[in-house]
């Protein structure tokens, strides 16, 4: 890394960005998949000049919205619109991240050249892009599917649904919200069959796995502790402000 004449905070940020680039497997990420082509095409039917914006982090690793995918989508859209007799001019750029305002500022000098923006980031990035440029229609090109772990190259498994009330300490590190088809907090339903889920027979019962894990750890007594039902009606868009940054948030 070049670090001469570099602000210390920017140097730290750059260090972690480059470190994350080098992680190709074994990481945690937001996993997404590209929307059906016809859906994307329909969203853009009234626009003739669109900037497709990729994201170089999570969606790039899972091959849904990085620089390569931006090029592929633009080629498909351009060809389809020509066939329909309604050609479209498409720009292409890929930001380091769309969930970081600092990187969204890079579009400031070009965004006015386009009628709309087509984002290939996750749902958080798409919303942040729309917030940064509120006068431009912003359309999603991908569907955000889950927070997952990279089991192997090209193989992602859902592990967390960001419920905001983690119970992994009581369930042996196995998430009942994610792994149980019914999201049960206090033991299995009556349909579990030989350790299999009644809804998905190829899927193990989450509470069978929890029982086996806790038993192996000598902590089976935890399975008898009642976990209160999550009050989903109290859910709202969540914000996390790290200690020491409260004044900055209040000022902003």
Residue ranges and their predicted role:
Residues 1-92, 105-117, 131-170, 174-252:
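Iron-sulfur (Fe-S) cluster-binding modules
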Residues 91-99:
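Short beta->alpha junction loops
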Residues 119-123:
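N-terminal glycine-rich "phosphate-gripper" loop used for MgATP/nucleotide binding
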Residues 125-127:
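Short, well-ordered alpha-helical microsegments
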């Amino acid at each position: 890394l070049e670090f001469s004449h570099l602000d210390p905070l920017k140097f730290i940020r750059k260090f972690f960005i480059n470190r994350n680039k080098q992680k190709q497997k074994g990481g945690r990420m937001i996993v997404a998949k590209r929307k059906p082509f016809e859906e994307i095409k329909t969203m853009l039917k009234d626009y003739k000049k669109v900037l497709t914006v990729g994201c170089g982090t999570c969606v790039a690793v899972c091959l849904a919205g990085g620089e390569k995918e931006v090029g592929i989508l633009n080629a498909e859209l351009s060809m389809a619109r020509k066939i329909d007799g309604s050609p479209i001019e498409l720009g292409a750029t890929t930001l380091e991240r769309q969930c970081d305002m600092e990187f969204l500022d890079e579009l400031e000098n070009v965004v006015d050249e386009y009628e709309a923006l087509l984002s290939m980031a996750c749902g958080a990035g798409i919303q942040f892009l729309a917030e940064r440029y509120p006068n431009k229609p912003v359309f999603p090109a991908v569907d955000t599917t889950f927070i997952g772990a990279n089991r192997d190259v090209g193989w992602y498994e859902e592990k967390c649904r960001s419920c905001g009330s983690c119970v992994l300490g009581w369930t042996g590190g196995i998430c009942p919200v994610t792994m149980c088809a019914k999201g049960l907090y206090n033991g299995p339903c009556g349909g579990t069959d030989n350790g299999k889920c009644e809804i998905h027979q190829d899927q193990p019962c989450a509470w069978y796995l929890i029982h086996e894990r806790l038993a192996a750890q000598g902590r089976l007594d935890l399975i008898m502790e009642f976990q209160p039902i999550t009050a989903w009606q109290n859910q709202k868009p969540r914000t996390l402000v790290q200690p020491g940054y409260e004044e900055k948030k209040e000022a902003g």
